[in-house]
Amino acid sequence: RKFLSLVGVMACATVRAQEKKVDGGLAVIEQKKIPRRTTPITPPGSLAVRNMEAHCTGCQLCVAVCPNQVLRPSGKLMSLMVPEMSYERGYCRPECTKCSEVCPTGAIRPITKEDKSSVQIGHAVWIAANCVVNTDGVECGNCARHCPTGAVQMVHKEPGNPDSPRIPVVNEARCIGCGACENLCPSRPFSAIYVEGHQNHRTV
């Protein structure tokens, strides 16, 4: 009897776990995986990866106040517990400066919303093999629609052929690395477009 009860409990737990992965009971949701970035992404106001690592004490105040769950502590040995950015759960909204307001050490310096809009912490990179245009044969354009700076544009896959599907092209000079494109890309498990960080932040 105890065995049957245990089996019943385990079965219920399995069902509940599966329900959490289903969107409204219609489709299974596959969680996004973190892309392999050559350079980590650090928040606007941190100036550079080296500055962030040199001044951060790992207090996690910035992680705690980030409303979009973009910041998380690094698990790398050389930068252990130093927050870095990733866009599986959200993206860095241009109007948010919360992390720069709470940093007590200067790892992330105070920055205004106006200044933040011109700071390039990284740039978007499109991976053709992951894009639904190529994997599923459907048009999307989610990345272009949600880019706050207009850095992502849709162009015909075959130049001169108006009937060919459209694919994204990134204007690196306008991209600020906010991650809206990466976060809202429907491709799974890896986004078809992701942000590569900059060692030193730039101005656009």
Indicate where each model-derived feature is located.
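Non-ligating segments of multi-cofactor redox enzymes
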Residues: R1-V204
